[in-house]
């Protein structure tokens, strides 16, 4: 389960940004997950809650967005998009000669903070 490592690194980045803006608490985080990143959203959500315990991000709302992967089909010479790594065939010609062109992995898109004291 590499999701725990991804969440630990994401939390480091979130805490750095929150600290830079004087946050007392992180209230929400938006993360985009690439279709071919091999990340299970349920595992990521569970691990994120786990690593945030005892930090300024504890209890924050996690928003996950799945991103399509852009692929090039060698057979029909077209760009196609796929939403899951489980499908490796071109939706146009059903060939399996796809080359991944763009899949942004895992990105922290937005962090919502609270700057006030409780």
From Swiss-Prot:
Keyword Methyltransferase found: no
Annotated residues for binding of Ni(2+): 2
Any one GO BP annotation for this protein: protein maturation
Binding annotation for Zn(2+): 73, 76, 90, 93
Record InterPro entries: Hydgase_Ni_incorp_HypA/HybF_CS, HypA/HybF
Protein keywords: Metal-binding, Nickel, Zinc
A GO molecular-function annotation: nickel cation binding
Domain of life: Bacteria
Pfam families linked to this entry: HypA
Entry keyword Zinc: yes
Family matches, as PANTHER family: HYDROGENASE MATURATION FACTOR HYPA
Function: Involved in the maturation of [NiFe] hydrogenases. Required for nickel insertion into the metal center of the hydrogenase.
Family the UniProt entry places it in: Belongs to the HypA/HybF family.
Protein name per Swiss-Prot or TrEMBL: Hydrogenase maturation factor HypA
Organism: Salmonella typhimurium (strain LT2 / SGSC1412 / ATCC 700720)
């Amino acid at each position: 389960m590499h999701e725990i490592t991804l969440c630990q690194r994401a939390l480091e980045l979130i805490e750095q940004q929150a600290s830079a803006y004087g946050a007392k608490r992180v209230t929400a985080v938006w993360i985009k997950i690439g279709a071919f990143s091999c990340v299970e959203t349920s595992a990521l959500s569970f691990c994120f809650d786990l690593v945030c315990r005892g930090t300024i991000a504890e209890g924050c709302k996690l928003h996950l967005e799945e991103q399509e992967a852009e692929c090039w089909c060698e057979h029909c010479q077209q760009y196609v998009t796929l939403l899951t790594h489980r499908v490796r065939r071109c939706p146009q010609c059903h060939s399996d000669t796809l080359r991944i062109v763009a899949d942004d992995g895992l990105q922290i898109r937005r962090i919502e903070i609270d700057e006030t004291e409780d």
